[in-house]
């Protein structure tokens, strides 16, 4: 026990007297305390940094809702505004929020934050009609707050005298302001009238949507009534005032719906602020020209493929008579155009066309018995009488050009009455526009034969191309299996208006028309009576009244055309010329006053009852000075020459057209729908939709 008692206090004094253990404990204690202090400081540093990061993140979130282009969270922006508000902003924010329909409150920051060089400034604000609060970055309060948005007369004088250096540091459009605006005192003059060329000062851009000089901030504070936003066409009437100092000229929005389409609509400098331009008001011209007839959009352009309906109606719109009944699938190779016949020139110069019809040509009488002869003798005479610059005919002769190759084409053009008749009204002088190719010799005929298959679109046959060229085709040299078969159905009706020579009936009957409807299958045997195919002034029939040819038609005198084979003769359908109400009326009503619209309407309804092909309706109305317009329009087309000498037919025009062989460049211009219609007056005179 003594040893244990002695051992006990001895061990206690030994442990208490050992200073190394105490110092170790103290060192351990201090080390723990230092570690805890370091850990605490680290935690406190983390807390501080997370507070700063949270504040930065919240700032970045409110900014990114504007910069990212996405829709901002309205509630969060409204809540986050409280710490950034200054007393100067508070009376302005209500009017600013109502300006944007209460959807978005713009984030406000005081001027110290705005001097940061890393700040992205707004490029383009309030210039798009897509409610640009969603699409553009927010404007900055450093300059924005200096402008009164409502009627704040107490602050206006105070804010007006703030230094402009503080204002200009806020937006980069202030750079444009300081460069472009030497005079900050003139106020914005309001929307200027539209001017075509963008001017830097008073003219405005293309429709005066902004004045490009971007005036200083102080001038915007002068009067709220001058702060209309003319570049926003939808909000212009609401007279909400906008500043223009933040605007960079970039987007041109055309508020006027009748802005001319040829004004360049591309903005001069594209916007980089995220706002989209309004493309609904921009007038882009359509890639194809508008159809000549708004109702008949089925026949849009001249390159109609292998649809004869397209080509017929387009030629009708262009003032070209469509002698077009040839089916598009017939591709006849080796076609010849026998225009080198010497009687063509004699019939051009001979006013007595009946004599030239009967005297030098045996093909007319016996073309069915002479299959080796050129069977386009009818085209020899229909071409000189109707299509060679005849001013009183609205149907230039493409009509009988396909008579040698197709029995379905209407081969009778209307009887010509030249406008040199005494008292002929100049209102009805129509210079034909047919794309005629009239070669005078065999070399020209061969050249036109080589050119014809290439000149129209590849889907058209050469026969179709030569029909539209007005070149009569000779299929008599082809083998008989390559000739075109007779058509069992009724071919296209053709309404060709001609004009009577007397001025009374010129005024009364401007749109009288003869309806020619050939039909196949009747036996040949009678030579056509050409009492209607001479011009006045020729042998003894010069001044006959106009109803005589119509009477000849209705009596069936022009009953039949002899073609190269007996089974394919063209016959005029006598019911088409009956004197009933289905036609234009009786002989007495021919010379009586009739409404041209009623006549044309009767022509329409009468044509629509005959045949399965297209109707060719050529009205006779023309504006005064029409032939001069056409001559001026055709002056630039190669292959057409305006000659003062005329065609030796005694036409009383000073501007006749002499048709030259049409080259490839002329035909490409011809197939362009805009080439022959350079101006709306000429185009309007071609329209056939004025039938009502």
Swiss-Prot record:
Modification N-acetylalanine occurs at: 2
Pfam families reported in the protein's UniProt record: TORC_C, TORC_M, TORC_N
Biological process per Gene Ontology, one example term: positive regulation of transcription by RNA polymerase II
Disordered: region residues: 1-30, 283-307, 336-484
Polar residues: compositionally biased ranges: 1-20, 448-469
Site description Required for ubiquitination and degradation, residues in chain: 628
InterPro entries (UniProt xref): TORC (IPR024786), TORC_C (IPR024785), TORC_M (IPR024784), TORC_N (IPR024783)
Motif segment (Nuclear export signal): 272-288
Protein name listed in UniProt: CREB-regulated transcription coactivator 2
Region (Required for interaction with COP1): 209-215
Positions carrying Asymmetric dimethylarginine: 51, 99, 120, 123, 161, 168
A GO MF label: cAMP response element binding protein binding
Post-translational modifications reported in the UniProt record: Phosphorylation/dephosphorylation states of Ser-171 are required for regulating transduction of CREB activity. CRTCs/TORCs are inactive when phosphorylated, and active when dephosphorylated at this site. This primary site of phosphorylation, is regulated by cAMP and calcium levels and is dependent on the phosphorylation of SIKs (SIK1 and SIK2) by LKB1. Following adenylyl cyclase activation, dephosphorylated at Ser-171 by PPP3CA/calcineurin A resulting in CRTC2 dissociation from 14-3-3 proteins and PPP3CA. Asymmetric dimethylation of arginine resisues by PRMT6 enhances the association of CRTC2 with CREB on the promoters of gluconeogenic genes.
Subunit details: Binds, as a tetramer, through its N-terminal region, with the bZIP domain of CREB1. 'Arg-314' in the bZIP domain of CREB1 is essential for this interaction. Interaction, via its C-terminal, with TAF4, enhances recruitment of TAF4 to CREB1. Interacts with SIK2. Interacts with 14-3-3 proteins, YWHAB and YWHAG. Interacts (probably when phosphorylated at Ser-171) with YWHAE. Interacts with calmodulin-dependent catalytic subunit PPP3CA/calcineurin A. Interaction with COP1 mediates nuclear export and degradation of CRTC2.
Similarity annotation: Belongs to the TORC family.
Skewed-composition ranges (Low complexity): 336-384, 391-412
Consequence recorded when altering residue 275 to A: Does not affect interaction with 14-3-3 proteins
Residues with the Phosphoserine modification: 70, 86, 90, 136, 171, 275, 307, 369, 394, 434, 457, 490, 493, 612, 622-623
Outcome after substituting residue 213 to R: No effect on COP1-mediated degradation of TORC1 under forksolin stimulation
Chain's role: Transcriptional coactivator for CREB1 which activates transcription through both consensus and variant cAMP response element (CRE) sites. Acts as a coactivator, in the SIK/TORC signaling pathway, being active when dephosphorylated. Acts independently of CREB1 'Ser-133' phosphorylation. Enhances the interaction of CREB1 with TAF4. Regulates gluconeogenesis as a component of the LKB1/AMPK/TORC2 signaling pathway. Regulates the expression of specific genes such as the steroidogenic gene, StAR. Potent coactivator of PPARGC1A and inducer of mitochondrial biogenesis in muscle cells.
GO cellular component terms listed in the entry, alphabetical order: cytoplasm; nucleoplasm; nucleus
Modified residues (Phosphotyrosine): 489
UniProt note on tissues of expression: Expressed in the suprachiasmatic nucleus (SCN) of the brain.
Gene: Crtc2
Covalent cross-link site, Glycyl lysine isopeptide (Lys-Gly) (interchain with G-Cter in SUMO2): 235
Keywords, ordered alphabetically: Acetylation, Activator, Cytoplasm, Isopeptide bond, Methylation, Nucleus, Phosphoprotein, Transcription, Transcription regulation, Ubl conjugation
Subcellular location: Cytoplasm; Nucleus
């Amino acid at each position: 026990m003594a040893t244990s008692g002695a051992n006990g206090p001895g061990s206690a004094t030994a442990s208490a007297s050992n200073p190394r253990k105490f110092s170790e404990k103290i060192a351990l204690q201090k080390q723990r305390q230092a570690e805890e202090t370091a850990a605490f400081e680290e935690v406190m540093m983390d807390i501080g940094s997370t507070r700063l990061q949270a504040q930065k993140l919240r700032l970045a979130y409110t900014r990114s809702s504007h910069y990212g282009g996405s829709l901002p969270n309205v509630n969060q922006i409204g809540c986050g505004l409280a710490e950034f508000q200054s007393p100067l902003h508070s009376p302005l924010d209500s009017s600013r929020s109502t300006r944007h329909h209460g959807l978005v409150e713009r984030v406000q920051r005081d001027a110290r934050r705005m001097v940061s060089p890393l700040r992205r400034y707004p490029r383009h604000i309030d210039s798009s009609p897509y409610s640009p609060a969603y699409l553009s970055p927010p404007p900055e309060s450093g300059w924005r707050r200096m402008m009164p948005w409502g009627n704040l007369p107490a602050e206006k004088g105070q804010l007006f005298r703030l230094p402009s250096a503080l204002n200009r540091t806020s937006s980069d459009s202030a750079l444009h302001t300081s460069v472009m605006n030497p005079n900050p005192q003139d106020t914005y003059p309001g929307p200027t009238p539209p001017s075509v060329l963008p001017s830097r000062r008073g003219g405005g851009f293309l429709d005066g949507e902004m004045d490009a000089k971007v005036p200083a901030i102080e001038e915007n504070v002068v009067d709220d009534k001058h702060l209309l936003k003319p570049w926003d066409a939808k909000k212009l009437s609401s007279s909400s005032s906008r500043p223009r100092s933040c605007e960079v000229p970039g987007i041109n929005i055309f508020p006027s719906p009748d802005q001319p389409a040829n004004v360049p609509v591309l903005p001069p400098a594209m916007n980089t602020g995220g706002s989209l331009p309004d493309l609904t008001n921009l007038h882009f011209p359509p890639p194809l020209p508008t159809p000549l007839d708004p109702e008949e959009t089925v026949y849009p352009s001249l390159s109609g493929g292998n649809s004869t309906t397209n080509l017929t109606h387009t030629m009708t719109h262009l003032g070209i008579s469509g002698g077009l009944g040839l089916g598009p699938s017939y591709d006849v190779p080796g076609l010849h155009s026998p225009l080198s016949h010497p009687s063509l020139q004699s019939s051009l110069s001979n006013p007595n066309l009946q004599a030239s019809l009967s005297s030098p040509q045996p093909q007319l009488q016996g073309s069915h018995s002479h299959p080796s002869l050129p069977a386009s003798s009818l085209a020899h005479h229909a071409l000189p009488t109707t299509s060679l610059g005849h001013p009183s005919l609205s149907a230039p002769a493409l009509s009988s050009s396909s008579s040698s190759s197709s029995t379905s084409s209407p081969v009778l053009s209307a009887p010509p009455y030249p406008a040199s008749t005494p008292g002929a009204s100049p209102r009805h002088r129509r210079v034909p526009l047919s794309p005629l190719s009239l070669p005078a010799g065999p070399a020209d005929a061969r050249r036109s034969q080589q050119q014809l298959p290439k000149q129209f679109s590849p889907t058209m046959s050469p026969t179709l191309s030569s029909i539209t060229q007005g070149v009569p085709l000779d299929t008599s040299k082809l083998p008989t299996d390559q000739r075109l078969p007779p058509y069992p159905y009724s071919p296209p009706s053709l309404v060709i208006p001609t004009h009577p020579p007397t001025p009374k009936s010129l005024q009364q009957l401007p749109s009288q028309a003869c309806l020619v409807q050939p039909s196949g299958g009747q036996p040949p045997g009678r030579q056509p009576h050409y009492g209607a195919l001479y011009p006045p002034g020729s042998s003894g029939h010069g001044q006959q009244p106009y109803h005589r040819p119509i009477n000849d038609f209705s009596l069936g005198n022009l009953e039949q055309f002899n073609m190269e084979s007996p089974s394919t003769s063209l016959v005029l359908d006598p019911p088409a010329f009956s004197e009933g109400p289905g036609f234009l009326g009786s002989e007495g009503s021919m010379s009586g006053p009739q409404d041209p619209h009623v006549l044309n309407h009767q022509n329409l309804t009468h044509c629509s009852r005959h045949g399965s092909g297209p109707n060719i309706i050529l009205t006779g109305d023309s504006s005064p000075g029409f032939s001069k317009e056409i001559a001026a329009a055709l002056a630039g087309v190669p292959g057409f020459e305006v000659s003062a000498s005329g065609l030796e037919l005694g036409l009383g025009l000073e501007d006749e057209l002499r048709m030259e062989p049409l080259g490839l460049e002329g035909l490409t211009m011809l197939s362009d729908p805009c080439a022959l219609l350079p101006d709306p007056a000429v185009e309007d005179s071609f329209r056939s939709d004025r039938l009502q």
